[in-house]
Amino acid sequence: MSHGGTRVSEAAIYTLEQEANPILRTPDWAKDAIWYQIMVDRFRNGTTQNDPPRARDWRSEWYASSPWEGRDGQSFYEWFVFDRLYGGDIRGLEEKLDHLSDLGVNALYLNPMFQAEGHHKYNTTNYIHVDENFGAGGDYAAAEAAEDLMDPDTWTWTRSDRIFLEFLKTAKARGFRVIIDGVFNHVGTQHPAFRDVIEKGPDSTYADWFDVRSWDPFKYEGWAGYQSLPVFKKSEDGLASTEARRHIFDITRRWMDPDGDGDPSDGIDGWRLDVPNEIALPFWIDWCEHVRSINPDAYISGEIWDRADQWLDGRSFDAVMNYEFAKVAFEWIGHRKDKITPSEADRRLAELRIAYPAEVTYVLQNLIDSHDTDRAVSKLVNPDRTYDSGNREQQDPTYDGSKPDADAYRRLRLLALLQMTYVGAPMIYYGDEVGMWGSDDPNNRKPMLWQDLEPYEESEENFVDTDLLEFYKQVIALRREHPSLRTGDFTSVGTDDEQDVWMFARSDDEERILVALNAGDSEASIDLPDGAWTPLFPTAVGEAESGRITIDRLSGRVWLEDR
């Protein structure tokens, strides 16, 4: 691939042949998915009629306090910023389907939708109902009071629930798939079962649901030490309580087949599972079988941060949030002092492809950031940190949380190009495409930037980066227009460690596409493989190329082989 003394790797063909489990199948639609993750409270406020009390103005300066914030002596990080609500809702989602369609994404992962306190909704109050502030407002209490938690025949559909179901209908009609967060390891303290335990102690019907360490005084296990998140009691098979297990299975069916007619087309298309590794695998094997009995085409992805071999062998999940991909991508494209070579990036990603069945590899959610990490572009101005470590400004004063420079955004574009051309389903965290930045929670969860709401306070920094948005549209369109980028074979053509270049190909029976990425700070010169190659990106114009070509620093090029 290159010349002189530069190391050139041998071409390594990876055909993604299914070997480990010949009957393992993942949903075909998930192989074509381009994911977009949305934290609903922070995406778009479609109507103020359902706003929670003291919802902040969408355009307000993030670090400025509202009149009611800090009156009790709290500071920004301790803790009033974490209590903020902005009023994002389902109507806002529907209102901005045009943005998502124009962007080119076709699959939505929504953070928790169920009734809960706070903005993130991981502290579930009730799995039976969509959060009232996402829907109609003020319709939860009456519904909860009239229902028996353990009897689905008593469950009703609130206006908020129906607003969500109508959104599903609208989104699907426009070509979107929709999955939601399943948070089945813990709940919030306002969950009816936990409230009953607080009231009745060991005499509660739900006493065996939770990991209670002492009844007098009352002490219980909270997730990660947070007492606001009481965890379900566990056994070696999953959940200790058979009734808690049954309840989760019942609400799973409720949201996958809302009218109960056996046709799941009116329900969600699948689940992203929160901290599933904290519940033993046998539970998930049974639960996934239950999910697929309702909808054989449902998609199940788990939040697993490391290698996930045992979760991806055909017995449980279809995929995971592919943080292993993100780690390699940043260590190659983002790091400076501890930067890995393209050969090392190639080797580590090859190991990951070989570790998982081919059907899984195609549907992994290839993300670069999420609601649980600092924003991708902020990572790039804070290099050489272990992924998702040392990335909170309130804990590490050396973290630079200011708006990133042009170099960081250039690296972000290269990461996005890798996402859109690599094997697996790319996933974008809301706002990355318009230039949003921020350290880890809470600063990675700012309200989405919208052109129709400009000017924002601090308008010299807070605006939609239209050039970046157009770039995202271009690379997403590239993936959508070429099936080989979604479901084709993967071939590592070569690496040039001296110039920091990696070249790989994606191919199927109809086409072969060549991708060359330069993660170096200098222009690179490389030799194309034999043949004639028509440019596809960054411009799809000009005559076919062959021989030696150049690639700008921190950028990539894509070609289609002439046949």
Where are these regions (language model features)?
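Extended acidic/polar, glycine-enriched regions
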Residues: M1-E19
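Loop/helix patches that line or flank the sugar-binding groove of alpha-linked glycan CAZymes
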Residues: A30, G46-F80, L85, D306, ...
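Substrate-binding/active-site clefts of carbohydrate-active enzymes
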Residues: A30-A33, V40-N106, M113-S265, W287, ...
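C-terminal beta-strand-rich structural cap/linker in extracellular carbohydrate-active enzymes
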Residues: I34, E545-R563
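Conserved, mostly hydrophobic/aromatic
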Residues: I38, L100, L110, Y127, ...
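Active-site-proximal helices and loops of the catalytic beta/alpha 8
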Residues: L168-F176, H186, R195-G201, I251, ...
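Solvent-exposed beta-hairpin/edge-strand motifs
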Residues: D530-A540
